[in-house]
A protein has these predicted regions:
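Noncatalytic partner-interaction/assembly domains of nucleic-acid and motor enzyme complexes
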Residues: 1-117
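Amphipathic alpha-helical
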Residues: 157-173
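Conserved small/polar residues in nucleotide/adenosyl-binding loops
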Residues: 174-180
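Residues within well-formed alpha-helices
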Residues: 36, 57, 125, 146-149, ...
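Extended, charged alpha-helical coiled-coil/arm scaffolds that mediate oligomerization and mechanical coupling
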Residues: 90-156, 160
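A general boundary/transition motif marking the beginning of the first structured unit of a protein
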Residues: 11, 15, 25, 135, ...
């Protein structure tokens, strides 16, 4: 069978698996990179690959508990949630770290992951709008209002950053601070 005929009609969703891997690897080698990635992505929603979603979710659990994020702790958290094997095991996690020589570009990679996730959301939203327009059960004004709300919520997502409470973050920087009478 001709290769073109095999893939004809196959619509691949927008994705950047290399950027996803770079984000996850960067998060395991640098705590600041982990904070930056989480502030951009917020949740695992923007990841395309399910195993990457699970790894990111394990990292979020570790961050929320103020635990370090590295291959050992992520592996342990994935074991607890019974996802270690399904994500590829400890070898996959160490492979993610090995693929990233530095975490310096984590923000760029996280933005790419977020952008691809938003494109997938836009495709889903536009498909839902098309279905409503074809059904024509509602008035045109109602369909336009819903379409506008859906698109607006995607637009808000574009510029949103996730903010974290200062206390868990400040714990890792206590060695750099001066004691004062002000509470943390």
């Amino acid at each position: 069978m001709d290769e073109n005929k095999k893939t004809e009609g196959l619509n691949l969703q927008p994705q950047a698996l290399e950027a996803e891997e770079a984000v996850l690897g960067s998060m395991m080698i640098d705590e600041d990179a982990a904070n930056k990635a989480v502030s951009i992505l917020g949740s695992s929603h923007h990841f395309y690959k399910d195993s990457h979603k699970k790894i990111f979710e394990a990292m979020l659990v570790l961050m929320n508990n103020s635990d370090p994020i590295d291959t050992v702790s992520v592996s342990d958290e994935l074991k607890k949630s019974k996802h270690l094997k399904s994500v590829g095991g400890i070898y996959y996690l160490t492979g993610l770290v090995d693929k990233v020589p530095t975490s310096a570009r984590v923000e760029t990679y996280a933005e790419i992951v977020k952008e691809k996730g938003m494109l997938r959301d836009l495709i889903i939203t536009s498909h839902e709008i098309s279905k409503k327009a074809l059904d024509a059960g509602d008035s045109v004004g109602s369909i336009l209002d819903e379409a506008e709300q859906s698109i607006f919520s995607l637009t808000e997502q574009k510029d949103s950053k996730i903010y974290q409470h200062i206390e868990p973050i400040s714990v890792s920087y206590t060695h750099l601070t001066l004691p004062t009478s002000y509470p943390v």
